[in-house]
């Protein structure tokens, strides 16, 4: 999962996950940090993960299906570049509309065999052809694993040439139209 809204009260773990029915042992982790929820008498998150950033992918482990609801302002993608290192990178999706893998990674230099994957889909870069696989479209609120050969900086584009990126899916168009509505994640 990734989070692409700036909450008025701040993007701490406890603010972002406030709508969850929290139980002891609920866990959120990024590539480098994690936080675990401790119930009564503590009733708080403890760990090295303090703030949620839009550049990162997160994994959340809950005891039962739950929904995260958020209300905030969308981030400007150009204000949140993502440093990409050779090897595996946990990448958040900053834009509030979806785009193709090719559009999203146009600022990177992929090599043959580089991989992008979501929880259930993937694409591999094939020189001379481009990204192939069943992951064709990156979406808001999803997190991705990117294995890449060349270091770079990922800045999701807001336009292609002189025109805005066209949303491909109806869901992406709907997401843009309701940016101020609560965002819901089902686990």
Residue spans for each PLM region:
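N-terminal exported-region signature
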Residues: 1-187
